[in-house]
């Protein structure tokens, strides 16, 4: 299944949760979910009772859409998490957080992961001094992630940094906003990652 590219606000309303897909509108309280916190359609305000399988599937969809990845990529990450020692769900979240597009977003250089992905694919991002244009590139602890020199005054990047100054930066990155670079200092603990996803249902789904 390909990565979702449809109307993001309708998707958020269908799933009933903000997926950080419309950063600036969400921060301003102007997203469709803020205005109409129910599913789209004639009967949207009457949410149907969801089965256990439906709940498991919904949590997987939320994670895929939030991080902007395909079913194939998601399954591959889950399989890697399952092979490692430790809590599979927490390890899955950790692997998702290590994606370069997500790290660019977490450092505040983009208001959404979708825009962060564009910055990466269009060659605006360096990792440890080398240009990397692969959104799924895994950022290791201690890595330096920065905006290339000619893009440091990009209005969208500057605007994103201004907006994230209001919301704050996560604790596992150190960012020099003026110089447009950051250090991915460590992998986050699961409780630090504030996302509307219950990954235990994803583990149950893939463990069948």
Swiss-Prot record:
One of its GO terms (biological process) is translation. Keywords: Ribonucleoprotein, Ribosomal protein, RNA-binding, rRNA-binding. InterPro entries: Ribosomal_uS4 (IPR022801), Ribosomal_uS4_bac-type (IPR005709), Ribosomal_uS4_CS (IPR018079), Ribosomal_uS4_N (IPR001912), S4_RNA-bd (IPR002942), S4_RNA-bd_sf (IPR036986). It comes from the Bacteria. GO terms for cellular component: small ribosomal subunit. Residues 98-161 form the S4 RNA-binding domain. Transmembrane segments: none annotated. Pfam families: Ribosomal_S4, S4. GO terms for molecular function: rRNA binding; structural constituent of ribosome. Belongs to the universal ribosomal protein uS4 family. HAMAP family: Ribosomal_uS4_B (MF_01306_B). One of the primary rRNA binding proteins, it binds directly to 16S rRNA where it nucleates assembly of the body of the 30S subunit. With S5 and S12 plays an important role in translational accuracy. Part of the 30S ribosomal subunit. Contacts protein S5. The interaction surface between S4 and S5 is involved in control of translational fidelity. This is Small ribosomal subunit protein uS4. It comes from Campylobacter curvus (strain 525.92). The lineage of its organism: Bacteria, Pseudomonadati, Campylobacterota, Epsilonproteobacteria, Campylobacterales.
């Amino acid at each position: 299944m390909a990565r979702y590219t449809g109307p993001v606000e309708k998707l958020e309303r269908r799933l009933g949760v903000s997926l950080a897909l419309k950063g600036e509108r969400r921060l301003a309280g102007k997203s469709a979910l803020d205005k109409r916190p129910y599913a789209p359609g004639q009967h949207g305000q009457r949410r149907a009772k969801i089965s256990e399988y439906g709940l498991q599937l919904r949590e997987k969809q939320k994670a895929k859409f939030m991080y902007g990845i395909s079913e194939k990529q998601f399954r591959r990450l889950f399989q890697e998490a399952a092979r490692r020692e430790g809590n599979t769900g927490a390890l899955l979240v950790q692997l998702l957080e290590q994606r370069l597009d997500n790290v660019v977003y977490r450092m505040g250089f983009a208001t959404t992961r979708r825009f962060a992905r564009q910055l990466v694919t269009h060659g605006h991002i360096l990792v440890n001094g080398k240009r990397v244009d692969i959104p799924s590139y895994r950022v290791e602890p201690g890595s330096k992630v920065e905006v290339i020199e000619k893009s440091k005054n990009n209005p969208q990047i500057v605007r994103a940094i201004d907006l994230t100054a209001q919301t704050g930066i996560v604790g596992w990155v150190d960012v020099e906003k003026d110089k447009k670079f950051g250090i991915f200092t460590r992998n986050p603990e699961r409780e630090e990652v504030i996302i509307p996803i219950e990954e235990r249902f994803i583990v149950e789904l893939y463990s069948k």
